[in-house]
Amino acid sequence: MIKILVSNDDGVTAPGIVALTNALASSYDVMTVGPDRNCSGASNSLTLTNPLRINTLSNGYVSVSGTPTDCVHLAIRELYTDEPDMVVSGINAGANMGDDTLYSGTVAAAMEGRFLGLPAIAVSLVGSKLKHYDSAAFFTSKIIKGLLESPVAQDQILNINVPDLPVEQIKGIKVTRLGARHKAAGMLKTQDPAGRDIFWLGPPGEEQDASEGTDFHAVTNGYVSVTPLTVDLTAFNQITSMKEWIDKL
């Protein structure tokens, strides 16, 4: 049976990872390994100065005292006797579109799977009330089936964003590029009970590039967005001009 590793960044007991695991368990051999707390915004961070501890929960899920990347790395390197066939990260509670992908622990967990040579998917549910995890699970299952039948290039992951709608109201699937946000709002400053300044990150910026063809545009218009993301961040179209710039120094 096909083996799928499921992870996330919202924590191993979050509703999204439960919905995803339940949807896949009837067709695949699923191992669910996630962080023991919410690690949203953890990106590709690793735990380097503390040991990782694991705990198997009553439902069989494995809780890890680390980041999403730690979870995937530990599962593949230690918990599996034979490697899984695929890594699926999610279902995230909220969008991972545009610039979000740089900060996302959900995307990072999928990236770690790809770093270790496995096909990988990150999936997020986009909306304010987040009622329809079943819709995200439905489309994820459909895309997994397609990937197993016809794999994509090995240097990429698929970043999926699903509008928070019933399945029958979703118009279809669109392949997209990343959009972009305006810069985030300023820090929120307040004081603790002792009168010392404390700070909270402000809300993310509003959509800046949500034009047709972007993930923002697709989801806003009722479509599932599938964006292929590459691991290599090199700006290849700038290599020649950068050489010319360096030569002038």
UniProtKB/Swiss-Prot annotation:
Keyword terms: Cytoplasm, Hydrolase, Metal-binding, Nucleotide-binding
Cofactor note: Binds 1 divalent metal cation per subunit.
Pfam families reported in the protein's UniProt record: SurE
InterPro entries: SurE, SurE-like_Pase/nucleotidase, SurE-like_sf
Reactions it catalyzes: a ribonucleoside 5'-phosphate + H2O = a ribonucleoside + phosphate
Residues the entry annotates as binding a divalent metal cation: D9, D10, S40, N92
Required cofactor(s): a divalent metal cation
Listed GO MF terms: 3'-nucleotidase activity; 5'-nucleotidase activity; exopolyphosphatase activity; metal ion binding; nucleotide binding
Origin: domain of life: Bacteria
EC number in record: 3.1.3.5
SUPFAM superfamilies: SurE-like
GO cellular component: cytoplasm
UniProt subcellular location: Cytoplasm
Family: Belongs to the SurE nucleotidase family.
Reported function: Nucleotidase that shows phosphatase activity on nucleoside 5'-monophosphates.
PANTHER family named in the record: 5'-NUCLEOTIDASE SURE (PTHR30457), 5'_3'-NUCLEOTIDASE SURE (PTHR30457:SF12)
Full protein name: 5'-nucleotidase SurE
Organism: Shewanella woodyi (strain ATCC 51908 / MS32)
Annotated gene: surE
